[in-house]
Amino acid sequence: AQLQNLVLKDREATPNDHTFVPRDIRDNVGEVVESTGVPIGESRFTISLRKTSNGRYKSTLKLVVPVVQSQTVNGIVTPVVVRTSYVTVDFDYDARSTTKERNNFVGMIADALKADLMLVHDTIVNLQGVY
């Protein structure tokens, strides 16, 4: 797939579009970034696909979102990353899987991330343990 702009919505009360623009392709990993004008504060999304030696297809999506604040040292204001969140999603398919099967697997994962599915939402958003 051609590396291109990727627009992702957040979950604010009024969702914001986050536009990631192509930055680079290195070792078959495409990278798009949400540019803030300061590279240290850029959110990054990467996507890759590789075929393993045993014929499986593995695709990985990664989202890296830093939180940046201004810091003043000796009267000089500079941006500094105060924390970073990471999400990694791995897909691992048998070479005999069909397009329909793969599409359904992706749909189930996308559906699992809906805010009204409390098991997943409470675990990954509210940081509640599974009991």
Curated annotation (Swiss-Prot):
Q: Which GO terms describe its cellular component?
A: T=3 icosahedral viral capsid
The yes or no answer to whether the keyword RNA-binding is present is: yes
Q: Gene3D superfamilies this protein is in?
A: MS2 Viral Coat Protein
For this UniProt entry, the molecular function terms from Gene Ontology, in alphabetical order, are:
RNA binding; structural molecule activity
| Binding sites annotated in the UniProt record for Ca(2+) | Q2, Y131
Q: Which UniProt keywords apply?
A: Capsid protein, RNA-binding, T=3 icosahedral capsid protein, Virion
Disulfide pairs here are none
User: What is one Pfam family matched by this protein?
Assistant: Levi_coat
Task: Please tell me where this protein is predominantly located.
Answer: virion
Places the protein is found: Virion
**Keyword RNA-binding on entry:** yes
Q: What subunit structure does UniProt give?
A: Homodimer. The capsid proteins form dimers that assemble by group of 5. Twelve such pentamers are linked together with free dimers. The homodimers binds to the viral RNA via an operator hairpin, but also to many other RNA sequences in the viral genome; this interaction probably shifts the virus from the replicative to the assembly phase and ensures specific encapsidation of the viral genome.
Q: Briefly, what is this protein's role?
A: Capsid protein self-assembles to form an icosahedral capsid with a T=3 symmetry, about 26 nm in diameter, and consisting of 89 capsid proteins dimers (178 capsid proteins). Involved in viral genome encapsidation through the interaction between a capsid protein dimer and the multiple packaging signals present in the RNA genome. The capsid also contains 1 copy of the A2 maturation protein.
Instruction: Give the UniProt family note.
Output: Belongs to the Leviviricetes capsid protein family.
Protein name, as recorded: Capsid protein
Organism name? Pseudomonas phage PRR1
